[in-house]
Amino acid sequence: MIKRLNNFFEKINIKPQTKNLINYTTYKIGNISKLFLIPKNIQEAENIFKAAIEEKITLFILGGGSNILVNDKEELDFPIIYTGHLNKIEVHDNKIVAECGANFENLCKIALNSSLSGLEFIYGLPGTLGGAVWMNARCFGNEISEILKKITFINDKGKTICKEFKKEDFKYKVSPFQNKNFFILKTELNLKKENKKIIEEKMNKNKQARINKGHYLFPSSGSTFKNNKSFLRPSGQIIEECKLKGLSVGGAEVSKYHGNFIININNATSNDIKSLIEKVKTEVYSKTGLLLEEEVLYIGFKNQKS
């Protein structure tokens, strides 16, 4: 492993940095990474991804830092690629072409200034476009797959591909990029011309809904559990019906505002969050027979699906 890592770093010619992931995750929980890479542009990112494939190195791609829980007990021993500088956004008629690290706020504001509608549902979320595509981000009855046109990515053979996708290629919180060694570079979005005032009203309405649900009061990863249509109601409602709002473990708590938010209310550890997630799952299953599935990804935990 050490030899492959040395070969990898020799090929990419980028010096790894030491960073604390507390500063890069929305949970404000994490640990030290001494293998933190910050590509300055798409070309550097391509070199990193292709070298990783050649050397069989597992990477973690870090965007906005939402929807993840990082182990704060162990040093992270795998390269982490931060996409924060891969944020170029271009407008072409009714299309936006954006790199994987473009954040939602900038995307939405550029779309608004260009009188383009279709991104209002993600306004107020902390993520990036690459992560949104990877997980088929969804909110307020809309999902990112509805506005996708083309995606440029590197496949598991190290080849850069630009491919058109349809909504049918995606499912609820599932994309063709999950469970594959593919790396999303940039995405073309197909939007619609609309009056700026109408777009802005939708954006503000969605942001206010998030404020009303307490999204910004405490650090969180966003929704903790996926919704399951067969349960006939959202996971947050099920958790509320089980009277689990306010349940806590250490510094972690089930939000009193939204049952599907587990928040870092008082210097929670990753174990606090993880233990509370398991406690909620156990209580819900005991009371309803329904097994909730996590939406949050576990990073740096041994023998843990991530």
From Swiss-Prot:
The active site is at S223 (proton donor), E295. It is found in: Cytoplasm. It catalyses: UDP-N-acetyl-alpha-D-muramate + NADP(+) = UDP-N-acetyl-3-O-(1-carboxyvinyl)-alpha-D-glucosamine + NADPH + H(+). Its EC number is 1.3.1.98. GO terms for cellular component: cytosol. GO terms for molecular function: FAD binding; UDP-N-acetylmuramate dehydrogenase activity. Pathway: Cell wall biogenesis; peptidoglycan biosynthesis. It comes from the Bacteria. Residues 28-194 form the FAD-binding PCMH-type domain. One of its GO terms (biological process) is cell wall organization. Coiled coil: none annotated. Keywords: Cell cycle, Cell division, Cell shape, Cell wall biogenesis/degradation, Cytoplasm, FAD, Flavoprotein, NADP, Oxidoreductase, Peptidoglycan synthesis. Its cofactor is FAD. Its main location: cytoplasm. PROSITE patterns: FAD_PCMH. Pfam families: FAD_binding_4, MurB_C. InterPro entries: FAD-bd_PCMH (IPR016166), FAD-bd_PCMH-like_sf (IPR036318), FAD-bd_PCMH_sub1 (IPR016167), FAD-bd_PCMH_sub2 (IPR016169), MurB (IPR003170), MurB_C (IPR011601), MurB_C_sf (IPR036635), Oxid_FAD_bind_N (IPR006094). Cell wall formation. HAMAP family: MurB. NCBIfam families: murB (TIGR00179), PRK13905.1 (NF010480). Belongs to the MurB family. PANTHER family: UDP-N-ACETYLENOLPYRUVOYLGLUCOSAMINE REDUCTASE (PTHR21071:SF4). This is UDP-N-acetylenolpyruvoylglucosamine reductase. The gene is murB.
